[in-house]
Amino acid sequence: MKKILLFIFSLLYITNCFAQETIQKKNRITDNVVEKFGVLKDNEEVKDGPYEAMYRRKVPVAMGNYTKGKKTGSWRFYDPGGKLMQIYDYDNHQLKYEAKEYTGTSDFYYTIDKEIADTDRITKPIKAGGRYYGYLPYLGMYKLPFNPYEYGTYGCVAVVELLISPLGRLASYKVRTVCNTLEYDQSITMNTKLFKEEDRQFIPATLNGEPIVSRILIRCQVKQDGGLEFIRE
């Protein structure tokens, strides 16, 4: 009996030695979304443990787990209304669920540079993270190139254009902004290397099972501070 107890205590001691201490952090992603996560105490750049992002402190828009800086297991993503948008398995890099998208109620459009026959089978490009949380980095990257408080942003709208390669890589990032009251219409292209590696990865569009080049267009409205947000947020 003593040997068994000694063995159990030894296992607990070894497990304790290998378990790394974490501390809890908060970070504001947007005006409305705050993320909560743990980081290693001896390296605060490495996320570890449960993760959640909350919309206006009430609605979870992302829930999952980090293991030593990597997303692991199945993550669930929601829109600001609490609707499940996507389930993505990061261990196997596999899409488990994607909510249906309807043209009349979506801020997203997709294009390909090919003629399509009635018999063709097409799949759209998909971003891990869903059609809300997954696209926050692309809206958050842009700011108006003029002082919004001096000129105002009333009537300003924007379209974010993401060019996705057949390998599922972000090949181009462009934003066109139109402010009718200011007679302003300008497109700005920015370096894709400004994004994190995971933000440059997509599931590519396919045509009859073959990966193809595609574009994702996101209609946005310009906020008072010159940033972007979804029209239907």
What are the functions of these language-model segments?
Residues 1-25:
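Bacterial Sec-dependent N-terminal signal peptides
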Residues 23-233:
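Charge-biased low-complexity segments
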